[in-house]
């Protein structure tokens, strides 16, 4: 095995081990929750499948124009 192949194997193994450790970490849940809160859809904005409504709001509709909106609960 040459140096480049050894480096690639080491890099892949470190990535796999890091992914396993991150999956078991409580910190990951907090970071993902923070990420979700930053991309949620606020009140009176159109709902989207990729971006859920923020806490305290829910997707309601569709309105007369066939678009659903996040509304305060």
UniProtKB/Swiss-Prot annotation:
GO terms for molecular function: potassium channel regulator activity; toxin activity. Keywords: Calcium-activated potassium channel impairing toxin, Cleavage on pair of basic residues, Disulfide bond, Ion channel impairing toxin, Knottin, Neurotoxin, Potassium channel impairing toxin, Secreted, Signal, Toxin. It is found in: Secreted. One of its GO terms (cellular component) is extracellular region. The record marks 45-46, 50-51, 69 as: Critical for the neurotoxic activity. It comes from the Eukaryota. Residues 23-35 form a propeptide. Transmembrane segments: none annotated. Expressed by the venom gland. Residues 1-22 form the signal peptide. Disulfide bonds join 40-54, 47-59, 50-51, 53-70. The record marks 39 as: Important for the neurotoxic activity. Its main location: secreted. This excitatory toxin inhibits insect calcium-activated potassium (KCa) channels (Slo-type). The presence of a 'disulfide through disulfide knot' structurally defines this protein as a knottin. Belongs to the neurotoxin 11 (kappa toxin) family. This is Lambda-hexatoxin-Hmo1d. It comes from Hadronyche modesta (Victorian funnel-web spider). The lineage of its organism: Eukaryota, Metazoa, Ecdysozoa, Arthropoda, Chelicerata.
């Amino acid at each position: 095995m040459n140096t480049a192949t050894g480096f690639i194997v080491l890099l892949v193994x470190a990535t796999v081990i890091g992914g396993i450790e991150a999956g078991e970490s409580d910190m990951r849940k907090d970071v993902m929750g923070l990420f979700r809160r930053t991309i949620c859809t606020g009140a009176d904005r159109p709902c989207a499948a990729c971006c859920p409504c923020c806490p305290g709001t829910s997707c309601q509709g569709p309105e007369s124009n066939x678009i659903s909106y996040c509304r305060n609960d």
